Amino acid sequence: MDHTSKTKGPLLPNFLSTLPHRLITQPNQSSSPFHDFTSTPPSPASLHFNSPIFTPTMTTCISLLLITLLISASVAASSDDSFRGAVFGVNSKFSGKERSLSLFKAHDNLRHLQILASGVDLPLGGTGRPDAVGLYYAKIGIGTPPKEYYVQVDTGSDIMWINCIQCRECPKRGYHGLELTLYDPEDSFTWKPVTCASEFCAEINGGAVTGCKPNASCLYTETYGDGSYSIGYFVMDVVQYDSVSGDLETKLANGSVIFGCGARQSGNLGTSEEALDGILGFGKSNSSIISQLASSGKVKKMFAHCLDGDNGGGIFAIGHVVQPKVNSTPLIPDEPHYSANVMKIEVGTQFLNLSTSTHGPGDKRRTIIDSGTTLAYLPDAIYKPMVNEIVAGQPDLRLRTLHDQYTCFKYSGSVDDAFPAVTFYFENSLSLKVYPHDYLFAFEDFLCFGWQNNGLDSLSTTDTILLGDLVLSNKLVLYDLENQTIGWTEYNCSSTIKLRDEITGSVHLVGPHSIPSGGRRMSSRYLISFLLITALLHHMIS
């Protein structure tokens, strides 16, 4: 694909049929000029692309003419390599820090409404604002010439979005002093508008957009529980990354992606010291980056991550992992999140009673797997028996509730010797074992459970289990959307995995690297801690 072309490319068929409507809301369109996103009230009007802000100046046009050949050659060369694989640098927010239960719970509170609004009632508390960096963040390049952006990698989000030039509230520096950058479409030679008349926008809204005018943008509005909101519009541009060229070797590549351009934010959405440039969504929806790349025939619709719970970082790969071997369980159909059925839970050698009259047949429990959540959240009917069984072998322990939410006790010995492991058994005989050193956290002078009771809210009736990084760390987790399965195996995430190149059939080693925590003027070869590698479908491009 010639990314230097300014003509509109083909629309992606059936592109966003599964996108949750709570995330993207398309207001009535008008033919007014570009909306001032700093004005009030916060009702978004259409964006008109013949507005001065989207019209290059004569100087810009001349400059673009002078660099066209150089950029065209660069993009064309890297486009061929993009069929080998994609590499994004990702790091852990909590790497190098003592595990803090309060820090983890605060992070999960900010995810509450994001999951709640998608049809899952998990009373984690908090406002639901995504104004804090997630567990793992990546560095990517966007535009031509590319600029660098730090984005949260999140399997619970369905779109990629970046703060844009119209956002006056957005911070210039974020987590650990990272230098943040506002995306400006006019600075990119390869950006394209996504209009309200596009198939993309129609599928977001479940049909044609009411009041859509020629050249008006496809808009979105995202609102949170405390009244904060984010307003923006969709664009298409080139996302640049490193591609796998051999064992532990990479080189530049790129691909075109539709993403949200955040133009206005209220409340603390744009002012948090832990903010990032945006979010890189790897959710199940057709709008996620994995679905976009797969719909264009560039990648297999499967990815894997191995999160190093001890050192931070790890591996994040798009493609067919051939080593280690991973067993799998079916994903629950028609679910907005990565969900599977837990059939049994074993604490030590004792099985818990999972029976429920409100959720599905038999004893199985719907369970969400979410790498963006830190802890694990259990229904009250599971939480209390689990905690009681864990401490049953230590009758002298005195349990205390701290800050009205943490179940804690004092203990100075080896937790792995004194307390049992907890094992979740899924369909297809897939098990997931969680050790005491995984589910117990230091908090003040106590040890506290990382298991959280999602039934503390008296209004909650959920029977859903939510498993976050607490159970996923130090495991290779494979998401296979082609076969609608998810699986995992215990693994050393500081080692390597093997990924198949679907073009040549060869197998390449992929391993973790390190990212410095601050600054932006850094070589891309030192910015990789997670590798997002795309292995491409040979029959789709041959």
Spans of features found by a protein language model:
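Conserved catalytic motifs of the protein kinase core domain
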Residues: 148, 275, 364
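Charged, amphipathic alpha-helical segments
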Residues: 216-223, 286-291, 401-412
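Disordered propeptide/prodomain
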Residues: 2-26, 34-37, 43, 47-151, ...
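Short, glycine/acidic-enriched loop or turn micro-motifs at the edges of active sites
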Residues: 157, 284, 373-375
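Short beta-strand-centered segments at strand-helix junctions
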Residues: 161-163, 278-289, 378-380, 466-468
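Eukaryotic endomembrane system proteins
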Residues: 233-246, 250-328, 332-347, 367-370
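Aspartic protease catalytic domain
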Residues: 2-15, 59-95, 132, 143-145, ...
